[in-house]
Amino acid sequence: MSTATLVVFPPPPPVPIPTYITSLGLGYSIAIALGFLVLISTIILSSYICCRASRLRFSASAANANANASFSDRGVIVPRIIFVAEDDDLESGNVVVGGLDHSVINSYPKFHFTKDITAVVNGDGFHDGEGRETTCSICLCEYMEEEMLRMMPECKHYFHVYCLDAWLKLNGSCPVCRNSPLPTPQSTPQSTPLSEVVPLSQYAADRRRSRR
């Protein structure tokens, strides 16, 4: 009787992975890592530029606010006023522009406004007066306590110092009544009365918003 013999063969060796496949996977990993670093760097740089620009804009606005505040006198902000005449059909040859000298404007009397003001300035000093205005006819803002005002010497109309100074540099007469302190009418051209002038100013709106 014959005996069967069982022969066991060893498993075949594993197939070797080509080296170019291994190097290709390493290259992909390096490329992905570099791309990720570039993306992160771009985001950080963009954020820095945006923050820098925002700070510069804030610094510029703060500098402008400080410059405007430096011209204030007891709470009065220098107004930026543009006067536009409603009747623009006049020929340019007939329009005469003139104003007063700085020394003449400075010679006009100044005083501090009070709520119970009952005196106006004349050539001899103070005397009682009635019907005093509480609103500047140039900037259309109410006078605040202790604000510095300047008065026209003839008609006794008074306004904010900066408002009247800016007006008199361009016009030699009162903004309300056209009265001129100069003796000869030829030396001071007739200016557009305030009732026919439209003041375009941010001063009034800013003052009203600040009081709310």
UniProtKB/Swiss-Prot annotation:
Q: Where in the cell is it found?
A: Membrane
- In its keyword annotation, does this UniProt entry include Amino-acid biosynthesis? no
UniProt xrefs under InterPro entries: ATL67-70, Znf_RING, Znf_RING/FYVE/PHD
Biological pathway: Protein modification; protein ubiquitination
**Catalysis: reaction(s):** S-ubiquitinyl-[E2 ubiquitin-conjugating enzyme]-L-cysteine + [acceptor protein]-L-lysine = [E2 ubiquitin-conjugating enzyme]-L-cysteine + N(6)-ubiquitinyl-[acceptor protein]-L-lysine
Record flagged with keyword Transmembrane helix: yes
Q: Where is this region: Disordered?
A: 182-212
Q: Keyword set for this entry?
A: Membrane, Metal-binding, Transferase, Transmembrane, Transmembrane helix, Ubl conjugation pathway, Zinc, Zinc-finger
Enzyme Commission code(s) on record: 2.3.2.27
Regions of compositional bias (Low complexity) in chain numbering: 185-195
Q: How does it sit in the membrane?
A: Single-pass membrane protein
| Gene Ontology BP term (one) | protein ubiquitination
ZnF start-end (RING-type): 136-178
GO CC field: membrane
GO MF term set? transferase activity; zinc ion binding
Question: Would you say which domain of life the source belongs to?
Answer: Eukaryota
Which family is this protein grouped under?
Belongs to the RING-type zinc finger family. ATL subfamily.
Give the protein's recorded name: RING-H2 finger protein ATL68
Q: Which gene encodes it?
A: ATL68
